Regions:
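Loop-to-transmembrane alpha-helix initiation sites
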Residues: 44-49, 148-164
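Membrane-interfacial loop-to-transmembrane alpha-helix junctions, especially the N-terminal start
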Residues: 12-24, 73-81, 125-136
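Internal/C-terminal transmembrane anchor helices
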Residues: 185-199
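Alpha-helical transmembrane segments and their membrane-interface exit regions
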Residues: 24-30, 51-60, 114-120, 140-143, ...
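N-terminal topogenic module of multi-pass integral membrane proteins
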Residues: 1-40, 199
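Aromatic-anchored segments of alpha-helical transmembrane domains
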Residues: 25-33, 84-95, 136-148
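Membrane-proximal helix-loop-helix units in multi-pass membrane proteins
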Residues: 42-119
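Membrane-helix boundary connector in multi-pass membrane proteins
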Residues: 37-41, 122-134, 141-155, 174-184
Length: 199
């Protein structure tokens, strides 16, 4: 929370690098501690550990190359604040369902981190690492199946919130590159993107 506030108030190069370092740590923690240790009994836990490990490596690459500048973008503030609130709604919904730790969803579990990251990148979306977005949106689609398989209705929050975010990220990307020649054209790509998000 402190780094996020500082990123809004004093977006210095040091704060931006600290936020990226925190994202490396957080995604590595999910990969190693959460999936390899605490979820060791689950089937295919190592695949999920690799998935989150790749996201950690993408953030590490971003930290080294300074690809994502974290430039503030006010266009999607309302959706951003909703996404920021969701990691705190997750535990409340679990608690309302009568669950207690360690069975309840917490703020540092994969879905909560995915929602927070999408909100953060949407707030600073002048230029973002689309690879991180693609991985997180893929994770959000997996969340639909988790609702039924693991009986976690809270994951509907992640899945439903990411669909408009996916559209906005790519629309923003195409809007910034309208002057460039693309096949198909940016106009048709935008319509394809709308169709995919609706589907």
């Amino acid at each position: 929370i402190l780094l996020t506030v500082l990123l809004y108030q004093k977006p210095t190069l040091l704060i931006k690098r600290l936020m990226k370092g925190y994202m490396v740590f957080l995604n590595s923690w999910i990969s190693i501690v959460y999936y390899m240790i605490y979820c060791g009994d689950r089937n295919y836990n190592y695949i999920l550990a690799i998935f989150w490990g790749i996201i950690a490596l993408i953030w590490l690459w971003d930290l080294i190359t300074n690809y994502t500048p974290f430039e503030r973008y006010h266009k999607y503030d309302k959706l951003t604040y909703i996404l920021y609130a969701m990691p705190f709604l997750y535990p409340l919904l679990s608690w309302a369902r009568g669950m207690e730790f360690p069975m309840m969803t917490t703020c540092v579990m994969p879905c909560s981190v995915a929602v927070f990251t999408i909100g953060l990148l949407l707030a600073f979306s002048r230029k973002v690492n689309l690879l991180v977005i693609l991985f997180l949106c893929h994770w959000a689609l997996i969340a639909f199946s988790k609702v039924y398989v693991y009986k976690i209705p809270e994951d509907l929050l992640l899945a439903s919130a990411t669909v408009p975010a996916i559209y906005l990220f790519f629309k923003n990307y195409f809007d910034q590159n309208l002057h460039k020649e693309t096949k198909p054209s940016a106009k048709y790509t935008n319509w394809i993107l709308i169709a995919l998000c609706v589907a």
